[in-house]
Regions:
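Membrane-embedded alpha-helical bundles that constitute the cytochrome b-like, heme-associated redox core
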Residues: 1-246
């Protein structure tokens, strides 16, 4: 009777797939969130309309801010799940950390150096994004041209949001690049050319989203500065104002 080796457990692969899927979801959410907040460049009315859309106002005939709270809570749970799955691959003690840094310096490969970037930005993002999402969960009705601008300027949230922007965009796009290499899609001919094309796309997307985010944040800061004497008052679009314009 022969002793056959035990079949490998499928769970590491399943958890790896779940980590990749949750990361992809968060990247797509990040891009949609950027598109949403960028609507402020079309004016206060545009941002107000988009905010009310996500509250279901045009389907339910009235805004339901709890919908935003529920989705923000869901995103926060996905972030926690993704972070927990990523922790599986962290070095467990200082010996493993030392071995990793030795190997990384020995390889001298830029893609290997991206892993500690992912760790640092992911660690910071977990805490910073939690603060941002908590504000959305407990006060969803404040997602409004003036409410958001007041938070940025009067609430002095802009330093946190700048750091969060940098961490989110770098972590998300680098993660997407690593995901594409890991799963082998898309491809552009031979592997070396694929890596070059994807890396150029990675840096271009990082620059695009950070630039867009900074410009958008500056727009909210300028609106918040002008609205500072009336901080706390939410925006009312012209078509909802009374005859006196109030």
């Amino acid at each position: 009777m022969t002793n056959r080796p035990a079949a490998p457990s499928p769970w590491p692969a399943r958890l790896d797939l779940l980590q990749s899927t949750s990361g992809l979801f968060l990247v797509l959410f990040m891009w949609l969130h950027m598109a949403f907040v960028s609507s402020i460049h079309l004016g206060e009315d545009a941002f107000w309309t988009v905010a009310r859309f996500f509250e279901g106002a045009f389907v339910l005939d009235r805004p339901v801010p709890a919908l935003v709270s529920a989705f923000a809570l869901f995103v926060l749970l996905v972030i926690a799940l993704h972070a927990g799955l990523a922790l599986r691959k962290f070095p467990a003690d200082w010996r493993q950390y030392r071995a990793f840094w030795t190997h990384m310096r020995g390889f001298g490969h830029q893609d290997t150096s991206l892993w500690p970037v992912q760790v640092a930005t992911g660690f910071a993002m977990f805490f910073l994004a939690s603060v941002h999402l908590y504000a959305m969960i407990v006060e969803p009705e404040a997602i409004d041209p003036y409410g958001s601008a007041d938070q940025v300027w009067t609430g002095r949230a802009w330093p946190l949001l700048v750091v969060l922007l940098l961490c989110v965009e770098v972590h998300g796009v680098v993660g997407l690049y690593r995901l594409a290499l890991k799963w082998g899609w898309p491809t552009f001919g031979d592997p070396a050319r694929t890596r070059r094309v994807l890396k150029r796309a990675m840096w271009a997307l990082i620059a695009l989203f950070i630039g867009t985010g900074l410009v958008t944040l500056d727009t909210f800061a300028r609106i918040g500065k002008a609205h500072a004497p009336h901080a706390g008052e939410l925006y009312t679009p012209p078509f909802l104002q009374g005859p006196s314009g109030q």
